[in-house]
Regions:
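Conserved catalytic cysteine-centered active-site region
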Residues: 37-40, 89-146, 150-180, 222-248, ...
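Active-site-proximal alpha-helical scaffold in enzymes
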Residues: 119-149, 178-216, 256-262, 364-387
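Short acidic, glycine/serine/threonine-rich loops at helix termini
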Residues: 56-58, 97-98, 154-160, 215-218, ...
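Acyl-CoA/ACP chain-elongation machinery
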Residues: 147-148, 153-155, 159, 207, ...
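Extreme N-terminal basic, low-complexity initiation segments
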Residues: 2-8
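Beta-strand segments within the central parallel beta-sheet cores of soluble alpha/beta enzyme folds
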Residues: 79-88, 113-119, 143-148, 200-208, ...
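Conserved active-site "lid/cap" helical segment
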Residues: 17-122, 188-198, 202, 221-227, ...
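Condensing-enzyme catalytic core mediating Claisen C-C bond formation in acyl metabolism
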Residues: 11-61, 167, 171, 191, ...
Length: 422
């Protein structure tokens, strides 16, 4: 049954014991509800991803269709079987109106609910989360999430679009993403006593590794191999970040279709890939206050990762997670030890936990609404043993991490997928 009746009985029991309620009592009831609720499995029925890059020959509709057609073919469903959709896009210049209409009209969806979402760089993952929750609730049986961005035509280059209003802080137009993240790298080095040379070599190793992985991926934007010298001798963007430490501006789209295991099996699917956790944490302003945050880490990532591991039942992420997008705030590397793990090859394609095996944000660029789903697409291929030349053994769990905004105020998303039953 999809009716969570045990929770009702548990709440009734607690209410008879508590004559007066305070915040701690309500938390007790909330926790009891969560522990009593049955967990409904959600699986990836199909996924699709467009070619990423400078897609001057294609508009956003073309990119959406490219990803959608691959996803529906992979899932083995027709558009009339999709009961609800979530549309992730962040740059308003490419669409008329803030609604789900562009997705519904482009894909000719059959008058179903389409929800447009935007949540910084976690926009695609937010769309995916909405689709998963819809199926988990029992509201629909098959749901779609699609993210798209056409950045090259808008002229967007990573700077905040803060000039449109008159109530914004005046410093915002001068704050760039490379500048703010460079400050975090500097704070990290100072806190952990990291030599600048080691920091630069670790970042160069990541860039070289990402380009090598992308050379095997026909859908990546940048597929050229580079050397450590190329990275270290490249122009500086914001100390210590150089040209090859920053991702490109790209166009792209990615799509996921989710359902229940029972429906997936009825459609002939085997070796199902389940959605283990979807967690998002959003800054509340505490990082900007004079507290314990020192600018060397992402508080939201630590919180989202902790929740995701708990939801997925992962107790030892360093040994249980098979693939990921790396960040030591994910608790894979111990605090301050991430650089050593990178230089030791821990995150290489042949390492213990391969990272950015598709080329990552570095080589796909960052079409904002599409990136989260594009990351999941690689996990989906890897877990299904369909990544071709990039295949990394026989993974069990895959983790993706989106972070949008700035170190002091951001949205952090951690999603875990894995073999059903693992």
């Amino acid at each position: 049954s999809r009716v969570p009746h045990p929770a009702i009985n548990r709440v009734a029991e607690l209410m008879t014991r508590l004559p007066e309620f305070d915040s701690s009592d309500w938390r007790l009831i909330r926790d009891a509800c969560r522990s009593s609720l049955p967990r409904f499995d959600i699986v990836l029925l199909g996924m699709g991803c467009s070619q990423f890059g400078e897609r001057w020959e294609a508009n956003d509709e073309d990119l959406m269709v490219e990803a959608f057609e691959e996803a529906t073919k992979d899932a083995g469903v027709e558009r009339h079987q999709i009961e609800a959709a979530w549309f992730g896009t962040a740059i308003e210049d490419q669409h008329v109106g803030k609604s789900g209409v562009p997705l519904a009209m482009t894909l000719r969806l059959p008058y179903i609910p389409v929800t447009r979402v935007e949540n910084y760089c976690a926009t695609g993952t937010e769309a995916f989360r909405g689709a998963c929750y819809a199926v988990a609730s029992g509201a629909v049986d098959i749901a779609l999430a699609l993210g798209v961005e056409k950045l090259k035509d808008t002229g967007y280059g990573g700077l905040p679009q803060r000039g449109r209003g008159n109530l914004n802080n005046l410093y915002w137009p001068n704050l760039s993403a490379p500048g703010s993240f460079a400050q975090l790298a500097t704070a990290y080095s100072a806190k952990h006593g990291v030599d600048r040379g080691d920091l630069k070599r670790a970042m160069a190793h990541i860039s070289v590794k990402s380009h090598d992985n992308a050379s095997k991926n026909p859908k990546a934007h940048l597929r050229n191999r580079i050397t450590e010298d190329d990275v270290l001798n490249a122009p500086m963007v914001a100390e210590p970040l150089g040209l090859y430490d920053c991702c490109g501006v790209s166009d792209g789209s990615a799509c996921a279709i989710v359902t229940t295991p029972e429906i997936a099996r009825s459609l002939g699917k085997t070796d199902l890939i389940g959605v283990k956790a979807c967690q998002i944490a959003v800054s509340n302003g505490q990082e900007l206050q004079y507290d314990e945050w020192d600018g060397s880490y992402f508080a939201t990532t630590r919180i989202a990762a902790k929740r995701a591991y708990q939801e997925a039942g992962i107790k030892d992420p360093r040994n249980q997670v098979s693939l990921l997008v790396v960040h030591e705030d994910l608790n894979i590397s111990a605090e301050g030890k991430g650089i050593g793990d990178v230089l030791d090859g821990f995150y290489d394609s042949a390492g213990s936990v391969p990272c950015q095996i598709d080329g990552g944000l570095k080589c796909f660029g960052h079409p904002i609404g599409a990136s989260g789903l594009r990351m999941l697409y690689e996990m989906y291929l890897q877990l299904g043993g369909r990544a071709g030349e990039r295949q990394t053994g026989d993974p069990v769990f895959g983790l993706t991490h989106n972070l949008g905004g700035f170190p002091s105020q951001n949205v952090s998303s951690v999603t875990i997928v894995g073999r059903l039953g693992a």
